[in-house]
């Protein structure tokens, strides 16, 4: 039987990403022996080498590296070079929702996007005399854009875990209910947009995963991996029916479109019946002109009123709600004054819950957004690094350059995101406003965000404990996570 290892290389110690487990499950369905190795950023080189010596055999065909945003560190680069030197005949394949890093010098192939079908073509080419995949050279690796081999819609997105994954009852897992989003917001560069029809997974698959994970591992808590979970009311009802049949009480977090939640009469009840108590609202802006420009045009007064009613409903009926309002700093026509006004409203009305804010990114490489091709129509223009250094202190400009470009030896190898300016602000000012908002968040002790609640893991902490966390109170839980990582490594190496 063909064998492979799939390394989860996310730097966050607390995260078991869904991607490597989905690929491993798919490989097993196709006759492979695939083992996932988690928390690789927290393994020493000696530990990683010991693991390889205990696992790699004559049937090992490839080593996979999986991350959501290509979290390739120097630590992983050294390990990858060791593999290439020690096992030169074993292929290295990375996969991510982002393009490969410039310094992945020993990785043979990088799959960009939902990767099951692209990986199928690649493996048949490598090991079964199949046709060569469409690939282009990108820095040091062969890049395969998975959109050429669409893995959506699929009949199901099941992930079944194994004993050697060492799942723990206090963990949060991700569960995929569908792929793609029916909407096309102007700032969004997700790979599957404008989906027509309901291609969500079946009730049977959803129920099977929930029951197996509870019966075998005692797991009850989940993040729903779908771009907009409440895009269709009938879909929410479908999964709600499953949850009401379970013999345990799960807790779900999901991306929820707030305007739909507010405008639909019974949507709140359906989400409550399904125990979707962690809700991430991509509001993006409370400025009316801005919201219209990004295609989220509900009246902002109605939006605020509706969000407060939703919060009141959940806070009154249970103590497991976490509503997170997310804003974009620098969205079209957003002013500094409107952002600070939004911040004041959050302080006055939302401190029992959470908010997040992100500087606007306009992608100019890889998958692009509507705004990528029309930013000049929305009063944006490119600003040079030289002008940014003239306007701002070096520390902030260095930070923005690193975030917006692929850098090596302090030089820009390739632009990732537009360095922009408009009449209201420039990209560095957006980062400064973002940082100020987070200073206020910490000062006012907002609660930990929806997905941060799901990320913080530790065997001594319950969901109730995590929901009490404000943004400042993390150390105890971080210590628990790192203790678990050490236990996990010992189990894998024993």
Language model features with spans:
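Short, electropositive alpha-helical surface patch
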Residues: 237-244, 334-352
């Amino acid at each position: 039987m063909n064998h492979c290892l799939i390394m989860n290389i996310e730097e966050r110690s607390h995260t078991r990403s869904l991607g490597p487990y989905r690929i491993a499950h798919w490989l097993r369905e196709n006759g492979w022996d695939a083992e996932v190795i988690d928390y690789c950023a927290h393994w020493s080189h000696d530990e990683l080498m010991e693991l390889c010596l205990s696992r790699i055999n004559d049937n090992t065909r490839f080593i996979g590296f999986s991350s959501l945003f290509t979290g390739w560190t120097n630590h992983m680069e050294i390990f990858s070079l060791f593999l290439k030197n020690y096992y030169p005949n074993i292929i290295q394949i990375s996969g991510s929702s982002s393009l490969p890093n410039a310094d992945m010098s020993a990785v043979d192939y990088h799959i960009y996007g939902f990767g099951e079908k692209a990986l199928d073509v690649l493996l048949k080419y490598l090991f079964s005399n199949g046709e060569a995949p469409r690939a282009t050279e990108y820095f040091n690796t062969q890049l395969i854009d998975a959109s050429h081999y669409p893995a959506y819609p699929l009949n199901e997105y099941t992930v079944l875990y194994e004993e050697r994954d060492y799942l723990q009852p206090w963990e949060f897992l991700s569960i995929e209910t569908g792929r793609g989003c029916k909407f096309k917001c102007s700032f969004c560069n997700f790979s599957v947009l404008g989906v027509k029809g309901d291609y969500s997974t079946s009730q049977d698959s959803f129920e099977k995963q929930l029951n197996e994970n509870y019966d075998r591992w005692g797991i009850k808590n989940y993040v729903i991996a779908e771009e907009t979970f409440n895009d269709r009311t009938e879909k929410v009802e479908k999964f709600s029916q499953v949850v009401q049949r379970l013999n345990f009480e799960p807790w779900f977090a999901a991306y929820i479109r707030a305007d739909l939640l507010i405008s639909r009469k019974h949507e709140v009840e359906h989400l409550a019946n399904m125990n979707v108590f962690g809700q991430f609202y991509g509001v993006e802006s409370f400025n009316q002109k801005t919201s219209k420009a990004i295609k989220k045009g509900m009246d902002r007064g109605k939006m605020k009123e509706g969000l407060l009613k939703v919060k009141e409903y959940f806070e009154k009926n249970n103590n497991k709600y976490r509503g997170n309002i997310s804003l974009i700093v620098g969205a079209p026509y957003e002013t500094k004054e409107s952002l600070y006004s939004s911040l004041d409203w959050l302080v006055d009305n939302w401190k029992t819950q959470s908010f997040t804010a992100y500087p606007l990114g306009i992608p100019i490489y890889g998958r692009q957004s509507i705004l990528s091709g029309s930013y000049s129509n929305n009063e944006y223009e490119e600003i040079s690094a030289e002008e940014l250094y003239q306007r701002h202190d070096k520390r902030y400009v260095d930070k923005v350059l690193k975030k917006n470009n692929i850098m090596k030896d302090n030089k820009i190898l390739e632009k990732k995101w537009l360095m922009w300016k408009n009449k209201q602000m420039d990209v560095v000012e957006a980062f400064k406003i973002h940082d100020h908002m987070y200073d206020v968040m910490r000062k006012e002790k907002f609660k930990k965000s929806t997905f941060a609640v799901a990320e913080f893991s530790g065997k001594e902490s319950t969901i109730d404990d995590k929901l009490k966390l404000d943004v400042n109170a993390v150390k105890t839980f971080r210590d628990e996570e790192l203790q678990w990582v050490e236990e996990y490594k010992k189990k894998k190496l024993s």
